[in-house]
UniProtKB/Swiss-Prot annotation:
Its job: Binds the 23S rRNA.
Keyword match Cell division: no
Taxonomic lineage of the native organism: Bacteria, Pseudomonadati, Pseudomonadota, Alphaproteobacteria, Rhodospirillales
GO molecular function per UniProt: rRNA binding; structural constituent of ribosome
The keyword Transmembrane is assigned to this record: no
InterPro entries: Ribosomal_bL28/bL31-like_sf (IPR034704), Ribosomal_bL31 (IPR002150), Ribosomal_bL31_A (IPR027491), Ribosomal_bL31_sf (IPR042105)
UniProt gene name: rpmE
Name by which UniProt lists this protein: Large ribosomal subunit protein bL31
GO biological process: translation
GO cellular component assignments: ribonucleoprotein complex; ribosome
Matches recorded under Pfam families: Ribosomal_L31
Family: Belongs to the bacterial ribosomal protein bL31 family. Type A subfamily.
Keywords: Ribonucleoprotein, Ribosomal protein, RNA-binding, rRNA-binding
Length: 72
């Protein structure tokens, strides 16, 4: 293998939405990855729809497109 061309592959801790944790290996730059949605909370697996807006993205979208609509 060529040296210095591959990303750093190291152990990280993945934190699920319920607070449980597990360790895996990844090229993710941080030491810990906190999930906003996972198989325990995803609507496709639970059958329950819930709205998740962790970074204000939904509010930003609604503000940007508030006046947008089909005009008759």
């Amino acid at each position: 293998m060529k040296k210095d061309i591959h990303p750093d592959y190291h152990d990280i801790t993945v934190v699920m939405t319920d607070g449980s944790e597990f360790v895996t290996r990844s090229t993710y730059k941080g030491e810990s990855l906190r999930l906003d949605i996972d198989p325990k909370s995803h609507p496709a697996w639970t059958g329950v729809h819930r709205l998740i807006d962790s970074g204000g993205q939904l509010a930003k979208f609604n503000k940007k497109f508030a006046g947008f609509g089909l005009k008759k």
